[in-house]
């Protein structure tokens, strides 16, 4: 069972890296949200979202990963980003 334990450790390390990368992504998107709020740009950019999903679906297919899974994951991520951008915008409006 040592091999199972070793493989699970590898999975745990990868999961940790995924969470760290998502955190980094959100830090950057927070900056984008602030720029959008300062420039009165809408939080939601449907064309950009579609571009991201399409690019990641292609990437996932090239890596033999289910593109529907990747779409689902990133739609959740993007939904959280838009919600955060709205909160950033609303915070700015409350200070004016």
What label would you give each PLM region?
Residues 1-96:
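Domain-level signature for soluble enzymes in the chorismate/prephenate branch of the shikimate pathway
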